[in-house]
């Protein structure tokens, strides 16, 4: 694990934004997890601002949210889905199928997560015949 210490929040935002961009440039099919909240909004917007000045290919990158609030519509301003969508996803032109988020409303969150590939489906173990 690499820990980066910055002198200010603005410097942190810049470092983190360039790390995200670097990952996309080095691995066009990268899968990147993003958190939400007051501390990450500025860096997400910074990625979008850099992209608008210096566009790069984002067609194969996939983003997923690390967290989500429940029992609110996705359109609610406090939903992590909406925060990421407005802060970075739309700015980078990410397709809906390349933006994975936990559901905000469901009668069965486990089922909804499995449907959306957030929970790895168990695969049956193969029986092997070790006789010789």
List each language-model region with its residue ranges:
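Short beta->alpha linker loops
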Residues: 7, 38, 104-107
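Short, glycine/acidic-enriched capping/hinge loops at junctions between secondary-structure elements
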Residues: 16, 43-47, 74-76
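Glycine-rich N-terminal segment of FAD-binding domains in flavoprotein oxidoreductases
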Residues: 26-53
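Electropositive phosphate-/nucleotide-binding environments in soluble metabolic enzymes
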Residues: 10, 14, 41, 78, ...
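Ligand-binding beta-strand-loop-alpha-helix segment within the catalytic cores
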Residues: 56-131
């Amino acid at each position: 694990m690499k820990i980066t210490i910055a002198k200010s929040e603005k410097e942190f935002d810049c470092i983190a934004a360039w790390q995200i961009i670097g990952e996309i440039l080095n691995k066009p099919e990268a899968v990147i997890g993003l958190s939400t909240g007051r501390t990450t909004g500025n860096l997400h917007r910074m990625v979008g601002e850099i992209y608008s000045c210096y566009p790069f290919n984002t067609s194969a990158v996939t983003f997923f949210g690390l967290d989500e609030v429940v029992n609110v519509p996705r359109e609610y301003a406090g939903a992590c889905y909406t925060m990421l969508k407005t802060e970075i996803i739309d700015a980078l032109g990410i397709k809906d199928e390349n933006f994975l988020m936990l559901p905000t409303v469901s009668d069965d969150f486990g089922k909804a997560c499995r449907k959306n590939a957030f929970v790895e489906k168990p695969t049956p173990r193969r029986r092997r015949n070790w006789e010789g």
